[in-house]
């Protein structure tokens, strides 16, 4: 009897890729696939600037490639933020830049450091280049600079800090960001992820963009997905020392900002009135919502202080986070339950419209009272 033919070995991924758990985005549907009001992905409840929508609709011929360098968009970003456009690199969302930063500056055997309850993409960014993710302890769900610095070793190559942090909403003031940077060796890249930075009151500016100008080892990333309301276009940007920008430009995807994305982004960044309106709306509704939740403290409901466009709520009483997550679906809302990030006791809820936040707060109150 003839021997069975030997099948060729199948391609095998690198060992470190097998350790990656795929990113889980906020859901859009609930039980049985019903469409719900989505307050799980931190999108802008005011939508998108009318100017950006108009520019997107007249972006040009989709059969043609976009400007590979996004020159006009970089110039507009530079004008608004006082940055030399040559020191700006564009990304397909800031996620691309976070991954590229790890890829460019870390590799097998190196360490990538971030705080517990940091953005889940940091773990993926570290593992996809073969580096070891190192998680520093938190301080009551916030960033502890001393704990981060204590975790630095001779193998540390990249430190990620989201400010404000996702999913906790915590924020480090300028002095603490500067202290973190001062405590790092100059050969360690500090990535300051400012996806939610535009939601900060200008008086609370954390100094990240200033550090990007003066330091040789700082990369600041920003996104158009949050306050600009352009999540569907996937536009991110970063700034830092020219050598860092050069490295990221070498390995980013070509034509990585679409024709419509460049047109919409250009109009959006010039419409700072929309940005300010979004910031005011968010601050007002967040304060109202948190106040209603704090009134439920005797039921074990604890909203964490937030400087972002969401609130992380801890449920430490009879009603669990899972109870509320499922219960809010019956009211027509999908929120973000976070057991996969070590927060089974917490829900992250995006700040929506006034009516939405009032209805959610009332629903949580009803659930708590029913559990007594």
Curated annotation (Swiss-Prot):
Its EC number is 2.6.1.9. Keywords: Amino-acid biosynthesis, Aminotransferase, Histidine biosynthesis, Pyridoxal phosphate, Transferase. Its cofactor is pyridoxal 5'-phosphate. GO terms for biological process: L-histidine biosynthetic process. It is an enzyme of class 2 (transferase). The modification N6-(pyridoxal phosphate)lysine is found at residue 226. It catalyses: L-histidinol phosphate + 2-oxoglutarate = 3-(imidazol-4-yl)-2-oxopropyl phosphate + L-glutamate. One of its GO terms (molecular function) is pyridoxal phosphate binding. It holds the Pfam family Aminotran_1_2. Homodimer. This is Histidinol-phosphate aminotransferase.
């Amino acid at each position: 009897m003839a021997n069975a033919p030997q099948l060729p070995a199948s391609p095998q991924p690198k060992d470190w890729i097998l350790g990656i758990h795929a990113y889980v985005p906020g859901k859009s549907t609930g039980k049985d696939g019903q469409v719900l009001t989505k307050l799980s992905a931190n999108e802008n409840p005011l939508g998108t600037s009318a100017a950006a929508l108009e520019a997107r609709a007249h972006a040009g011929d989709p059969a043609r490639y976009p400007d590979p360098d996004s020159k006009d968009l970089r110039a507009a970003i530079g004008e608004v933020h006082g940055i030399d456009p040559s020191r700006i690199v564009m990304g397909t969302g800031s996620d691309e830049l976070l991954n590229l930063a790890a890829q460019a500056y870390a590799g097998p055997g190196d360490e990538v450091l971030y705080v517990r309850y940091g953005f889940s993409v940091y773990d993926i960014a570290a593992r996809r280049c073969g580096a070891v993710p190192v998680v520093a302890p938190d301080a009551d769900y916030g960033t502890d600079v001393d704990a981060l610095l204590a975790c630095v070793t001779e193998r540390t190559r990249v430190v990620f800090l989201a400010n404000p942090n996702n999913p906790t909403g915590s924020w480090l003031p300028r002095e603490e960001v500067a202290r973190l940077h001062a405590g790092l060796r100059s050969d360690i890249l500090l990535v300051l992820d400012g996806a939610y930075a535009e939601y900060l009151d200008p008086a609370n500016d954390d100094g990240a963009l200033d550090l990007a100008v003066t330091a040789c080892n700082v990369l600041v990333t920003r996104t158009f997905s949050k306050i600009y309301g352009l999540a569907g276009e996937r536009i991110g940007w970063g700034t830092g020392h020219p050598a860092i920008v050069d490295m990221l430009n070498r390995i980013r995807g070509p034509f990585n900002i679409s024709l419509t994305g460049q047109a919409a982004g250009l109009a959006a960044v010039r419409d700072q009135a929309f940005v300010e309106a979004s910031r005011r709306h968010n601050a007002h509704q967040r304060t109202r919502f948190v106040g209603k939740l704090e009134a439920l403290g005797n039921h074990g409901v604890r909203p964490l202080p937030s400087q972002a466009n969401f609130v992380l709520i801890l449920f430490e009483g009879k009603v669990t986070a899972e109870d509320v997550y499922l219960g809010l679906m019956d009211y027509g809302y999908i929120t973000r339950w976070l057991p996969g990030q070590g927060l089974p006791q917490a829900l992250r809820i995006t700040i929506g419209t006034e009516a939405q936040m009032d209805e959610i707060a009332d629903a949580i109150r009803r659930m708590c009272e029913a559990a007594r």
